[in-house]
Amino acid sequence: DDEMHIMVGYPWFAVRAPDELIALPGCTLAIKHREDYEAIMGTLVNALKEYVETGTKHATIKEIDIPDTSLWAIWAIQQYKRFYGIGECRERYGEIVKFIVDAIRNGRIPNLYINENGLLSTNGQNSPVTWLSATIDGRPIIPRTGYIVEYNALWYNALKFAVALYESDEMMAGYVDDLNNLAETVKESFIETFLNDYGYLYDYVNGAYADLSVRPNMAIAIGLDYSPLDRRQRKRVLDFVTRELLTPKGLRSLSPKSYGYNPTYVGNPIEREYAVHQGPARPWLFGFYADAYFKVFGVSGLSFI
């Protein structure tokens, strides 16, 4: 067919929606392959809309049903704005951004629930719902569930980005006000829910349980264009990430000080599955770290990065 995709890994991995969206800007926009970006994003957008509207999953794109796919789609579109400006971004992708935001607000994304405090929650007890997707016998090794830190950082970012797309349109003034009000609620709830007394962010919060594992998902929360944290709060989180997760190869998937740390991906398939997200570094997360560093330190951070 005429579709274009990015494979997660050849030949053993398929096309997976969240991974494809995370990789898309770097694989296309960063090397001036605009047409490839638009072709791949067009396929993804159509697949996502079809899934939300009818429940039909794309034949080739796997994990279109993972709840954060919609959030990563908006993030990937936001990167298009970085390269080609807000006007072109709004013209080409404004409709799908609004579609996704409204679908989330109206509870139309399966296993993605908006709560009275504005935060999003999901059920990851029985199957993985984030990139920490290792399983044994089909069950997630890291059962992140409830309020997940990067979900809600991406949600706040999505709301503020939608505001930026539509704030110049007088006909959308009421809609923009609604999104701004919701974003403010999300911001307050995010800080109350995730920012702990140690100065970093809980990885996920499920009822009375708050996961203290120091993981790189907090780097996503402080590296987004719109973060719910102020500069001082971001600096404290950044210090934790720098001290416990930063390596020359990327960010560790778990701090050496956290329970279960295992930096070596060796052994039989079960041993490797247990280890894969318990310490080994991920290069792609360094992009969020670099963005966060520049947001805190400005151009003075260039020599460090």
Task: Give each language-model segment a name.
Residues 1-14, 38-58, 109-146, 185-284:
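Extended glycan-interaction surfaces of carbohydrate-active proteins
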Residues 97-100, 179-194, 305:
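Short amphipathic alpha-helical coiled-coil/interface segments
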Residues 14-20, 24-129, 148-152, 156, ...:
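Aromatic-rich carbohydrate-recognition surfaces in CAZymes
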Residues 26, 76-79, 107, 161, ...:
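Amphipathic, soluble alpha-helical interaction motifs
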Residues 161-167, 221, 225-228, 288-297:
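Extended, well-ordered alpha-helical segments in internal regulatory regions
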Residues 1-12, 87-88, 98-106, 166-168, ...:
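Acidic/polar, glycine-enriched structural segments that form the non-catalytic walls/loops
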